[in-house]
Regions:
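Macrodomain-like recognition of ADP-ribose-binding/processing modules
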Residues: 1-260
């Protein structure tokens, strides 16, 4: 089965699951068809999927992983000041490390906005539908939504990493309060503590709360760097931390702060 056939099959199965999609027209062009599939992945509610669906989905996502390319830690350079710390600008879903961190929302179910350009959306897209189901089961077992500053771990499924650690950072309405700053630090600490508990040696962390959650980037970076440095100085497990940024503004902020 080639990629086009896999996409057509997966869209067909997703249409069968949702009566609202009955009249959905599948585009002819491969690129548009691929976008439609991602949008359907994004909006699919957590539920079990058939073995055949998962098999073909996993094959498709492995093809996509090859097309998009993955980045090995050995190809990156640590910062001159500390060989345990890396700064990398790029798509976190391409990193082949022990764990990547997801800037999640309190449901842990991923971003359900079709084709939205956020890390939560990308991670759930390229991990596969298993990730949303796993997160749903964690919250169901917990009995309440994920509190700000806490963290959960799941397999990474079809991502190059082995695990995804999900954390909910504080959401800022105006300016961050001291409580907000403490909660952001707590998110980083919860992530690192969970990584250590699971013997994770290499971990990539995005700029938590600085996207849709509106935490000021400069202040967030200071909190991130200080919290990570303090933790790994006392950890015998975590060997490598990659600060993952997605834009030039955060890249410049981290470069300056890490050089101090």
């Amino acid at each position: 089965m080639d990629k086009d056939a896999m996409i057509t099959y997966l869209i067909g199965e997703l249409k069968k699951e949702n009566l609202e999609l009955h009249d959905l027209i599948i585009p002819e062009e491969l690129e548009e068809k691929q976008k439609l599939l991602r949008a359907l992945f994004n909006t699919r509610k957590p539920k079990a999927a058939s073995t055949q669906f998962l098999t073909i989905q996993d094959l498709y996502l492995q093809v996509r992983k090859g097309e998009r390319g993955f980045v090995q830690l050995s190809s990156l350079q640590p910062i001159p000041q500390d060989d345990r710390i890396y700064l990398w600008k790029g798509d976190i879903t391409r990193l082949e490390v022990d764990a990547i961190v997801n800037a999640a929302n309190k449901t842990l179910l991923g971003c359900m906005k079709p084709l939205h350009d956020c890390v939560d959306n990308a991670i759930h897209t390229y991990a596969g539908v298993q990730l949303r189901q796993a997160c749903f089961e964690l919250i169901l077992e917990q009995g309440y939504e994920e509190p700000v500053g806490m963290a959960k771990i799941t397999p990474a499924y079809n991502l190059p990493s082995a695990f995804v650690i999900h954390t909910v950072g504080p959401k800022i309405v105006d300016q961050p309060t001291q409580i907000d700053e403490d909660l952001l630090a707590k998110s980083y600490l919860s992530v690192l503590a969970l990584a250590e508990k699971n013997n994770i040696e290499s971990i990539a962390i995005p700029c938590l709360s600085t996207g849709d959650f509106n935490f000021p980037k400069q202040k967030a970076a200071k909190i991130a760097i200080q919290t990570v440095k303090t933790f790994i100085n006392e950890s015998s497990i975590i060997k490598k931390v990659i600060f993952n940024v997605f834009d030039d503004e955060n890249l410049a902020i981290y470069q300056k702060l890490l050089a101090e």
